[in-house]
Amino acid sequence: MCYKYYQKYKLNSDADNFLTDEFDNVVNQTTDEPLYTDEQENQAIQEQTPKNGGTRGISSDALKYKGYNVAGKIEMPTVRLQYPILGDKVNGSWQVTDANAIEVSVAIQYGVGLNNVGNTVIMGHNYRSGLFFGSNKKLQVGDTIYITDWETGTRRAYTIYNKYTTEESDTSFYQRNTNGKREFSLVTCQSNNSYILVVLAREAE
């Protein structure tokens, strides 16, 4: 029992230190001039492709956490947790290409990519200690979650609008119609591994 809580502390501490010392240091770099005009940003959203490899010219594989590519960052104030989001861009879509990635953080399972129009599925283990998505059961409809994508450095607020349990084989929510909105889905297993807990969120208005 003591080891499990030490493991949670160590992994959370590693994640916090990484996000503060490496991720945020780059994302928070600013310039005197806007990186995008409103027209350019709208065009980039329509194309769902960051210009020039991202607004700072950084690519998705420019930063690694414990050997895995970093796609962005998730902040969940309700449960006081934040983690790097791991993922790889493959043929224009996002996924985690190494199943071992979810042993060190949360990762993209499927989707258009963080902060893009459409749905992105983010998965994480459910540990009793609360590590990774083990505290997702405490999240409620109306809670705010923040996503920062590494490609553009944009931090957006999302609001949870649905939370439910379904069979592990259910992937019907993966390709749902978001009506032109940015959305994401958080997925974690339940204690018996036959069901999953799904949390749906869309960009806050």
Predicted feature residues:
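Solvent-exposed, non-transmembrane regions of membrane-associated and secreted proteins
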Residues: 1-205
